[in-house]
């Protein structure tokens, strides 16, 4: 089964509400939808970045250019079922650009799984679970609005874990914001925070203990991504769990963080690692070091979220659950099928491959004009 064609499409999908982070406010998400054709079948994948190149080194524009000009010409004519060869070819030809590689890797997994009439989860080893506890992100920047949102989610039995974005205000203001949310949800929910690199080590060392006292269970990426030493010291000094996100940008960074036991948990993201196989390798590194895995998101659409669900469903342990909220943050979906959240958990889609199919009318509607 030879690869016959690889196509890319940039789509821009508005969010239902602005998401305020320490580094930007997100009003829309841009994705590159990849379709790989072989043997009469089409596999689909997705690449993207939160807020474009502000968060990382890639954007929808760079992802499309790398695939169209470097990766696609390299892979056309190759065996679509040989996933290892495809990864090796991409890594030799292109340095970095992990989201571009991930988009193709996901599409090839989807294609192979469809050809074998298997789900991706079954293709890569089988499921440990059919659903995963899912956290909702509170990022309106308004305390009353965030509390109302949390209480509505609890009442609807959609979410009882909440992640609050910090770093856009002063630490003192953030602390009061958190205290109000923790008090409002009481014992009905847990609260974790994401600083998105917004603090230096001194600020983090002062305010993380206060967040812990307020009832926070986990602090995500409190300091800049390159400061592994600060992460290690903060992990050693605090009882609350420290989660690496932006710092976890390659297999080598996973090894360094694990070797030094610099954090308590890894936020896994397929686009950060270059695809499915490398994400599984990072999870294995974490397991060997006694570090927890967490199901992270790049605010993926239904395509990327389905791919992540298949991967996370195979892992032995996810004590903090996941945050695969992208499809519900967006104002519309790009697939024919919805994903389901029920009883505080997101459920693995059924069917071969990803378990979702593109809605080509929606893709055309959101395609960026040339």
UniProtKB/Swiss-Prot annotation:
Extract the coiled-coil ranges from the record. none
GO annotations under biological process? amino acid catabolic process
The catalytic activity of this protein is classed by the Enzyme Commission as 5.5.1.7
The answer to whether the entry has keyword Transferase is no
Pathway in which this enzyme or protein is active = Aromatic compound metabolism; 3-chlorocatechol degradation
State where Mn(2+) binds: 194, 220, 245
Catalytic activities: 2-[(2R)-2-chloro-2,5-dihydro-5-oxofuryl]acetate = 3-chloro-cis,cis-muconate + H(+)
Entry keyword annotation includes Metal-binding: yes
Required co-factors = Mn(2+)
Q: Give the matching SMART domains.
A: MR_MLE
Q: Where is the active site?
A: 165, 323
> Remarks, anything else?
Different ratios of isoforms are detectable, depending on concentration of dichlorprop.
Xref: PANTHER family: O-SUCCINYLBENZOATE SYNTHASE, O-SUCCINYLBENZOATE SYNTHASE-RELATED
Family as reported in the entry's similarity comment: Belongs to the mandelate racemase/muconate lactonizing enzyme family.
What is the name of the protein in this document? Chloromuconate cycloisomerase
The species this protein was found in: Delftia acidovorans
- What does UniProt list as this organism's lineage? Bacteria, Pseudomonadati, Pseudomonadota, Betaproteobacteria, Burkholderiales
Q: Which gene encodes it?
A: tfdD
């Amino acid at each position: 089964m030879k690869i016959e064609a690889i196509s890319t499409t940039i789509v821009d999908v508005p969010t239902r509400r602005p998401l305020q982070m320490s580094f930007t406010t997100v009003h829309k998400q841009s994705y590159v939808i990849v379709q790989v054709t072989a043997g009469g079948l089409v596999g689909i994948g997705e690449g993207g970045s939160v807020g474009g190149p502000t968060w990382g080194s890639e954007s929808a524009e760079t992802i499309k250019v790398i695939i169209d000009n470097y990766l696609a010409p390299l892979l056309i004519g190759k065996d679509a079922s040989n996933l290892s060869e495809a990864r090796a070819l991409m890594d030799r030809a292109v340095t970095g650009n992990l989201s571009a590689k991930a988009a193709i890797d996901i599409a090839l997994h989807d294609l192979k799984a469809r050809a074998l009439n298997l789900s991706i989860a079954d293709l890569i080893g089988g499921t440990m679970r059919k659903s995963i506890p899912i956290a909702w992100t509170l990022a309106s920047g308004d305390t009353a609005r965030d509390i109302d949102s949390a209480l509505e989610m609890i009442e609807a039995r959609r979410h009882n874990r909440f992640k609050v974005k910090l770093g856009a205000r002063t630490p003192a203001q953030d602390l009061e914001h958190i205290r109000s949310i923790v008090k409002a949800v009481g014992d009905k929910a847990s609260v974790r925070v994401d600083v998105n690199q917004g603090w230096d080590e001194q600020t983090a060392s002062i305010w993380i203990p206060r967040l812990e006292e307020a009832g926070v269970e986990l602090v995500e990426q409190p300091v800049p991504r390159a400061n592994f030493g600060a992460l290690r010291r903060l992990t050693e000094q605090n009882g609350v769990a420290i989660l690496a996100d932006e710092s976890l940008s390659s297999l080598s960074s996973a090894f360094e963080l694990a070797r030094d036991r610099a954090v308590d948990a890894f936020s896994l993201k397929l686009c950060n690692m270059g695809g499915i196989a490398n994400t599984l390798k990072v999870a294995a590194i974490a397991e060997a070091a006694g570090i927890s895995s967490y199901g992270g998101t790049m605010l993926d659409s239904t395509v990327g979220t389905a791919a992540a669900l298949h991967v996370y469903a195979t892992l032995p342990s996810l004590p903090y659950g996941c945050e695969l909220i992208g499809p519900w943050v967006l104002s519309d979906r790009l697939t024919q099928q919805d994903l389901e959240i029920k009883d505080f958990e997101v459920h693995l889609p059924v069917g071969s491959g990803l378990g979702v199919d593109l809605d080509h009318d929606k893709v055309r509607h959101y395609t960026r004009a040339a």
